[in-house]
Amino acid sequence: MKYLCIHGHFYQPPRENAWLEEIEIQDSAFPFHDWNSRISAECYSPNALARVLDGNKDLIDLASNYARISFNFGPTLLSWMEKREPEVYQAVLEADRVSRGRFGGHGGAIAQAYNHMILPLANARDKVTQVKWGIRDFEKRFGRRPEALWLAETACNTETLEVLADEGMKFVILAPGQCKRVRKIGEEKWQEVGAGVDPKRAYLCNLPSGKQIALFFYDGPISQGIAFSDTLSSGEKFASRLLSTYNSGEEAQLMNIATDGETYGHHQKFAEMALAYCLKKVEETPDVELTVYGEFLAKHPPVYEAQIVENSSWSCFHGVERWRADCGCNSGMKPGWNQKWRGPLRSALDGVRDEMIKTFESVGAQYFKNPWDARNDYIDLILDRSLDAQHKFFLKHATEKAWNDRPTALMLLEMQRNAMLMYTSCGWFFDEISGIETVQIMQYAARAIELNRVITGVDLEPGFMEALALAPSNLKDLKNGAAVYERYVKPQAMPIEKIALEHVVSLLADETVNPKKAYECEVLAYEPKKLTAPGFHLSYGDITLKSVTTLLERRMHFAVFQRGAAEFLCAAGAEGTMDKNAVFAKLEELFAAGKYDECASFIRQAFEKNYPLVSMFQDVRRKVVDLVLRKMDEETDKKFTEVFEAQYPVVRGLQLIGAPVPKPFLTAAEFVLTADLKAEFRAADVDVNAVEELMEDVKTLGLDVSKGPVRDAVTEKLTLLAFAFARNPSDKACALKLVEFLNYADIFGFEPDTVKAQEFVFFGLKALGEDAKKKDILRALARKLKIAL
């Protein structure tokens, strides 16, 4: 029998600020908030509902690719997805449930080492915790025990395999170059095969402990071709390439490939459609069966055994040197650069990690019955910060001292969590120590160092920076890792005073902000007083925050002084650092007297911490900018409308005698007509006559408003109409309204994005079955949205 298994490794490096657990706006991901959001739209979401097209490029099916392949998602990525893309997250979980029914009880999903640490380079305890956390995270999300765990970069050694076997993992997926030699079970002679290993079978690996684990080696050349050639340019080509690999033998053959999951849609646009078509084609091929590794292993246990190449991986020719040395592996995009910084960076991290181990063992012994057991179980609190979960955790692990001082106990565990996050593999993968991935892992180191300082009073940062100074940058103005840390990491630190002030500014700029939540903190009390004058605003008072992560609680006094639209002075001080009543009275006196410069100077002197707006999280700055722009838009709209209404009759007269239309008027006209069209399409019922009149004006003035905001508004309306149809597909009026809207969109040349509308209508028509083919209006609707009936 012939089998096919396609594995997708879905992972993104963590991008959250180490203090806030939130991702800052990333302009390079525009028009999305950040790269996670962009990649989700391009890959994770489309693969949950992938399109299959016929020869006419009409839609014939929508199916979850996840439900028919083997896959893993990084736990840190799933954590983000659960909060920010809940529909996609649920689709991933549901796909695994569906796949268990398809593949004999074996789900397509497998676990992953928690934060993509290179396990052969990790110390023994980190190996264990990374595997335990990855498994526990999987169990919590998928509701079952995983059969396997994906190793970051497939980096492997015998010690790592022992940890996997200890945790009951049945198999591991490796690159063919990671195979050292094979032999038939029961035979004595080994065959040195290396990368020439036959990838069409499972292999048994006998470990020194006496335990065993199965090995699958993916097809290297085909996997590489899929990732870096045009194989995915069509589903037919993809399927043909995979189906051409089988030989004529009668034994079970497993064609298996493994690539980054982001290949399907992000790295290669529309590749999720090629994957969907390929899977459908394979399902229709009589002698080939889709499978996942767990099912194949159960049906066809290994008859060969294999040994691995120690300290090997899929992305470094030199084993695992890419994550600790200047081995020559890099992106290839910066000829002449070196990676001599990799070794010193790892040494710097190892140095602070070892000091934090001492802290954890000495101080931790006062707070936990067994600190390392507590760390292994800390994943339960990471996944559930509720009071009930904390109570259960403390019942199991806490000493009496921990019960009386929970914040310190939790800070110890958070220190260890960040001390592992700082080894995320992406920090070494690329070319330069100032790259965002490397800055990110330094940020985790900074957070861990800060927690160690709070717990012990000992500051590890000077020694860490001294070690980082030995890590050379390729950029002259940066020189070394210490300069990178100083420039890019330190400004990202978020003391609780700054978190409080950012929350106050957010509330002033955006009424939709949750007043009870400031990033990872609860707002227990917020008692502001506000004073306003033309061009000035002063907000001051008390605020109390409590960290959900560490339970650390802080009451603070604050003042936010605003001059003009976007000039903010923000200051805060812990309770007890000032005579609050005297300070607040002085602020009131100065502001009431119009002594605004003195008011600002007094704030700088009276409060412990001062922060300009420019130092704050970019999302907060954007809230202020958005508020300013909204006010500007309102004023602009009013002025442009006055200009348009007053001058349009004159302009029409000028056109009649062949005179050119003044450019300033055209600017005003485009603004006004765009706003009016948006308003029409966002109304509950579109007034077609009004749209026709507006478009006549657009045509008369030679404007083009078919793109941008108007197109977006048309797309929104189309999607809403399609959703209404999907909820009640037998309602002829819904179908008619949708067809008429599509006709008008064609007439006016709006070209809306039909992706979501097509999905809704497809499922609506599918619910009607054969009846959909019998009604003219439904056939017309299908034609308009290119859906095959």
List the model feature ranges, each with a label.
Residues 127-151, 243-256:
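CE4/NodB-like, metal-dependent polysaccharide N-deacetylase domain
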Residues 3-8, 13-125, 129-130, 147-151, ...:
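Short, well-structured secondary-structure segments
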Residues 442-452, 472-477, 569-571, 699, ...:
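Eukaryote-specific, cytoplasm-facing alpha-helical/coiled-coil scaffolding segments in long proteins
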Residues 63, 81-85, 177-179, 183-197, ...:
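Extended, Lys/Arg-enriched charged tracts that mediate electrostatic binding to polyanionic substrates
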Residues 90-103, 107-108, 132, 144, ...:
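Acidic, His- and aromatic-enriched active-site or binding-groove loops in soluble protein domains
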Residues 1-55, 76, 190-508, 534, ...:
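Active-site and substrate-binding clefts of carbohydrate-active enzymes
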Residues 116, 145-156, 260-264, 434-439:
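Conserved short loop/turn motifs at secondary-structure junctions
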Residues 650-789:
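Extended alpha-helical scaffold segments
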